[in-house]
């Protein structure tokens, strides 16, 4: 009888700390909105009506980086300023202009944080990607990494881009049925309509993506596997031109390029932004000033939150996590 009484406190402590340990496990949903400019996210009275959920969560329960009017700067470190290079930098934490200089379907020689997480026993078979753009599987090098990337559909806005609504539904299905600990979601209609000069459809796509993010968050809040344990990080792969205007001469940066364009000669194309909220994010609201944040810091930030070892092929990190936003 006495040994049993002595064991009771120990059993109680094991139950309490075992529960707390489980609760401490972090899950992440990383969302990219292709080619959405910081101006649409941060400028003017329209911002609260255009992206109400990002503002509700980022301002009150998280952080927002990239409002250049407040001297908060985020940008890509690569010199290409296009989607493949932006996503590779975002997810791999390195720049590789030597090998990545266009949007062709080539297998990425760099390893993404998703691939590194998948290689860890804690995340084995618990990492997924869902994308609207059919180049994402190559950026994640799904042939080498064997990551499950959901991107196929007959419902498409173009040959390479499927409807974002399909991507949302597939992402929700993945959350509910597969319970990944790390999920990457990529929406692409903003960039598609931007390139085609359809301003209202570009804005509609941005607003729609905001509502999609709300649905993904609410899905997580209704599931004990995610509730209280999940961090959302939303960002973009590149910026766009700043205004209407003529093209620059060959080799010059065009400071008056149309918002429909992006690339290494289009001023503003390197400018990005980030909104984060959830379990591991400090409540800093809309941030001001400070050092420039680079898109290559996103991957090590994800790795830091999930406690995934993160180094490049030389066993040295190229970029550090965005420590100031982390709890």
Cite the ranges covered by each PLM segment.
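Non-catalytic, well-ordered alpha-helical segments in soluble enzyme domains
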Residues: 121, 278-282, 289-323
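His/Cys-centered metal/cofactor-coordination and adjacent catalytic loops
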Residues: 44-53, 68-70, 89-111
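Short, structured active-site-proximal loop/turn typified by the sulfatase FGly-forming signature C/S-X-P-X-R
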Residues: 42-82
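Histidine-centered active-site microenvironments of extracellular/periplasmic hydrolases
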Residues: 235-277
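Beta-strand elements within well-structured catalytic alpha/beta cores of enzymes
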Residues: 25-37, 117, 181-188, 205-206, ...
């Amino acid at each position: 009888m006495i040994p049993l009484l002595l064991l009771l406190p120990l059993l109680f402590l094991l139950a309490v700390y075992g529960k707390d340990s489980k609760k401490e496990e972090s899950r992440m949903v990383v969302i990219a909105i292709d080619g959405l400019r910081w101006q649409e996210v941060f400028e003017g009275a329209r911002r609260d009506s255009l992206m109400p959920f990002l503002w509700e969560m980022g301002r009150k329960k998280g952080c927002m980086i990239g409002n250049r009017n407040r001297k908060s700067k985020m940008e890509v470190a690569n010199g290409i300023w296009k989607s493949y290079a932006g996503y590779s930098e975002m997810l791999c934490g390195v720049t590789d202009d030597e090998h990545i200089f266009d949007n062709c379907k080539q297998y990425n020689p760099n390893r993404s944080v998703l691939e590194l997480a998948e290689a860890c026993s804690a995340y084995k078979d618990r990492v997924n990607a869902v994308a609207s753009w059919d180049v994402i599987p190559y950026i994640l090098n799904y042939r080498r990494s064997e990551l499950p990337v959901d991107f196929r559909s007959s419902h498409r806005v173009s040959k390479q881009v499927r409807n974002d609504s399909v991507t949302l539904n597939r992402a929700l299905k993945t959350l509910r049925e597969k319970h990944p600990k790390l999920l990457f979601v990529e929406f692409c209609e903003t960039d598609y309509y931007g390139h085609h000069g359809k301003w209202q459809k570009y804005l509609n796509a941005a607003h729609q993506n905001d509502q999609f993010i709300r649905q993904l968050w609410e899905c997580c809040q209704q599931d004990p596997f995610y509730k209280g344990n999940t961090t959302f990080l939303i960002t973009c792969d590149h910026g766009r031109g700043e205004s209407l205007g003529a093209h620059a001469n060959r080799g010059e940066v065009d400071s008056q390029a149309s918002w429909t364009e992006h690339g290494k000669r289009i001023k503003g194309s390197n400018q990005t932004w980030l909104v984060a909220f959830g379990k591991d994010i400090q409540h800093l609201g809309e941030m001001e000033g400070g050092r420039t944040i680079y898109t290559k810091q996103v991957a090590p930030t994800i790795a830091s939150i999930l406690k995934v070892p993160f180094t490049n092929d030389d066993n040295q990190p190229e970029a550090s996590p965005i420590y100031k936003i982390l709890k």
